[in-house]
Amino acid sequence: MPNSTTEDSVAVPLLPSLRRATNSTSQVAIVGANVCPIESLDYEIAENDFFKQDWRGRSKVEIFQYVFMKWLLCFCIGIIVSLIGFANNLAVENLAGVKFVVTSNMMIAGRFAMGFVVFSVTNLILTLFASVITAFVAPAAAGSGIPEVKAYLNGVDAPEIFSLRTLIIKIIGNISAVSASLLIGKAGPMVHTGACVASILGQGGSKRYRLTWRWLRFFKNDRDRRDLVTCGAAAGIAASFRAPVGGVLFALEEMSSWWRSALLWRIFFSTAVVAIVLRALIDVCLSGKCGLFGKGGLIMFDVYSENASYHLGDVLPVLLLGVVGGILGSLYNFLLDKVLRAYNYIYEKGVTWKILLACAISIFTSCLLFGLPFLASCQPCPVDALEECPTIGRSGNFKKYQCPPGHYNDLASLIFNTNDDAIKNLFSKNTDFEFHYFSVLVFFVTCFFLSIFSYGIVAPAGLFVPVIVTGASYGRFVGMLLGSNSNLNHGLFAVLGAASFLGGTMRMTVSTCVILLELTNNLLLLPMMMVVLLISKTVADGFNANIYNLIMKLKGFPYLYSHAEPYMRQLLVGDVVTGPLQVFNGIEKVETIVHVLKTTNHNGFPVVDGPPLAAAPVLHGLILRAHILTLLKKRVFMPSPVACDSNTLSQFKAEEFAKKGSGRSDKIEDVELSEEELNMYLDLHPFSNASPYTVVETMSLAKALILFREVGIRHLLVIPKTSNRPPVVGILTRHDFMPEHILGLHPSVSRSKWKRLRIRLPFFS
C-alpha cells in the first residue's frame, strides 16, 4: 500500500513550538544541539543606484583581484582542511592507540578487571569532555553538521554554524568522541569543519577584534560565501577519505543546490590541493614518525588484486547484496529517526540530561566492546600470515586479547579497535579464513545498533564511517556464506556491502561509488559497485527518505527540494499569500520606518511610489531590513519629503551594505534617534532593488517554487492580475512553500491523492 510517511509527507519536527504552530512567521530549528532562530539567505544581486555606481567605479585591478582571490581562497581552504584532517586522524589514532596498548598490556598480565576499568573510565572521560565543551561552548558543533551545511547551501542561515568557536569545538570534540571508542565517524564533522574554514576565510576577518582584510570585502555576500562553503564541504570529504574526485561529486550530488561549471573547477582545485598535501604528510607517517597508529586513518584500504575477476554467476549474490542493503538501510534510517525523537524529549529537560545521556552511551559501549570478544573462541594463527600474529596493542588483524600464545581473537580484531582499522581488517584481501561466522555476525549487529544510539549524543559525531563499517561487516558475512561458490574474495564482498549500505542509508550513488573506489584502489569493482548502489538506493527509496533529509526535517530546516509536490499544481500563488503586507513609500518618514521595523520581523519590504512621484501607485522595488538599518545608522535624513542628491550616495561605502559574518547582526533596538530625527524623511530609492523578481498571483504554486529555488532568492513579490488594485498583493518567502504551512492554510487539500508511491510494512507504520 502507498505510504506517505517520508519526504512527501508533512514534516513532524522535533521542536514542540513547531508542532504547535506551523504558521508562525518567525522560524526556528535545531542547529547542532540547541534551538536557534533561522533566516533565509539572499543570492540575488540588489540592482540599485548605489550598486551600479559602485560596480562602475571598480578598476581592472580590483576585478582581477576579485578573480585571483577566489582561487587563492580555494587554495587556502585545501591547505587548511588537509592539515586539520591529518591532525584529526593523527590525534585519534594516538589517543586510541595509547588506550588500547595500556588495556592490552593489563590483559596480558591477567588483570582483566583493571583493564576494563582503564578502558571504560578513559572512554567516559573523553566522552564527558566532548559533550561538556559541546553543550556549554558551541552547541552548534553537535552532530555531523552535514544537515546544517546542506541546509545552508539550500539558502537557510543559522547563527554560529560557521563561527570560529564552532570550528574549534568541532575539531576537539570530534577527536575526543571518536577516541572514546564511540561508534561515530569523522567524515561528517570534517565536512562541517571544511565549511567553517571556508566561511571564516571569506568573512575577511573580524571587526570585533579589529582584524579585517579590506581585500576580502568583495566576498561579503551570500553568493560568494555559498561557493566557498561548497568548496569547504568537498575538501572535508576529500580529507576524510583521501578521495578528491569523490569530494567533488559529493558536493555536487548531496550538498549543493546550485551548481555551475566555474564552481566545479574551483572545487576540483581545492580537493586536488587536499590530496597533494595529505600524500606528503602520509609519506612522513610511513617512516614511523606519527606515533603508535601511524599506519591507520588516512592510509588507503587497499584491496586491489591483479587476479580479481568475476563471472555471470557472481551477479546474483551481488543483486541480493543490493536488495539487503536497501532494506537494512531504510530500517536503519527508520530506527535512527525514532531514536533522535526519543533523545529530543530527554534533551528538553536540560543540558544536564544531555551530558548524562552521552555518559550512559559511553559506559554501555565500553561494556559491549570489552565484553563481547570473550564470547568468541580463540583461533590459531595462520602459518602464512603476512603480519605479526598475534598483534599486541597495535592495529592489525590478529588481536591476542584473552587468547593463549599462538592464537588470536577474531572478534576482538574487529570490535576492540578503531573504526578505521576495523574497516581495514574487513576490507583486507587474502583473509578469507581469518574471521568466524559468529564473530562477523555479532560485530554487524553491534555496529548497526550502537551507531544508531551513539549518533544523537551532544558531541560532534558523523555517520559515514559507522555506515561503512556496518555495511562491510554484513557484506563480508554474505561472502563467507557463499564461500567457494563465488569468485570474489571476502574483502571485495565487504566493499560491496559497504556500498550497498551507503546506498540504502544515504542514497548517494555516483559520489559513493567514486569515494569507495578511491578508498580501496580497486577499479575492477566498478561495474559491481554501480549495480549494488543502484539496487540498494532503488529499494530503500521505496520505504523512506535518505538519512540527511530525515534529519533536516526533524531539526525543522525549511529545505526546498528540486521538485514541487503534485498538490502544489492545484494551488495558485494567491492562495498561500498571507498578510498583513508592510509597504514603504519611496520617500518615507523615519518614524514610520522605525515603527515598522520594531513591530515586525520581516526582512524585506516593497517600496511603492504614489502621488506626486507617480500618477498611480507603482512598484519601485524591494529593500532589505539590513540595508534600512545601515541607512538609519548613517542618519542621511532630509527635513522634507524630497529625493536625495548624488552627494548622498558618496557618503556610503559598499562594505557598509555587505553581509556580516557569524558575528552579531544589527538590530533596530541598537539605533537611537532623537525626536527631531524621527520627524525627518529618508529616500529609499537609491538603495532599493529596482528589479526584484515578481510573479502574478494566478501563477501555480509549483511553478513559483521552481523559480524561487532555481534563482536562489529570498523574497518573491506577488503582483495583482488586474490594474485597479495595489501594485503588490504579497511576498512569498521560503516559509510559504513549506507543506505544513500550505496544508495549514488549506486543510481540505487531499494529500493522499497526490502522494508518491511508498511501500507500507507493519514494522514501518
From Swiss-Prot:
Residues 568-640, 687-748 form the CBS domain. The modification Phosphoserine is found at residue 646. GO terms for molecular function: voltage-gated chloride channel activity. The keyword Transmembrane helix applies. The keyword Phosphoprotein applies. PROSITE patterns: CBS. It is a multi-pass membrane protein. It is found in: Membrane. The chain crosses the membrane at residues 67-87, 116-136, 167-187, 190-210, 232-252, 262-282, 315-335, 355-375, 438-458, 462-482, 494-514, 515-535, 715-735. Keywords: CBS domain, Chloride, Chloride channel, Ion channel, Ion transport, Membrane, Phosphoprotein, Repeat, Transmembrane, Transmembrane helix, Transport, Voltage-gated channel. GO terms for cellular component: chloride channel complex. It comes from the Eukaryota. Putative voltage-gated chloride channel. Homodimer. Interacts with PP2A5. Belongs to the chloride channel (TC 2.A.49) family. This is Putative chloride channel-like protein CLC-g. It comes from Arabidopsis thaliana.
